[in-house]
Amino acid sequence: MEEKKQVPQIRFKGYVDTWEQRKVSELFRVTRGYVLAATQTETTKTDEKPYPVYSSQTKDQGLMGYYKDYLYEDAITWTTDGANAGTVNYRAGKFYCTNVCGVLLSNEVKANQMIAEALNSVAKGYVSYVGNPKLMNNVMADIVIQIPTQAEEREQLSSFFAKLDNLITLHQRELYKYLRYQILKVRRKS
């Protein structure tokens, strides 16, 4: 990003407008999830418990299980407490999140993958490491990010990042299968 013009060096064709610097609190309503015991969730999605529950863990992108109710839809979450404080994700669809997740709800702009990635690239720098690492709501609200002024450009970037994430996940699964196969092959020889 060029400092003076606020125009990215690389971008999709057809976009020429400058990007703008905005505080998170100007773009979103900042809130957080609610306490939910893990015993109230299921490990797999069921008809009775169809909504994903996200927590502060990194396993399965923070997926703790599934629950009967949802709190939010199409929003950005971040881990507020613990070793993963400052990890930011876009959550498509309806979901529940625990009290160790902050939530950004669409207000001025639509929550999407592009904005989640922009925040994820800077959020760790705002984590307080005094005692238990934390990134509280008031701190997240004051973070300034640069975003395209045009909603269409934000959506195109969001779609690009979502496709890239899906491709990475696919390759990780393939790599896991390959490594598992190789390990089993070596064990059979011994």
What name fits each language-model region?
Residues 1-190:
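Feature detects amphipathic, helix-rich regulatory segments
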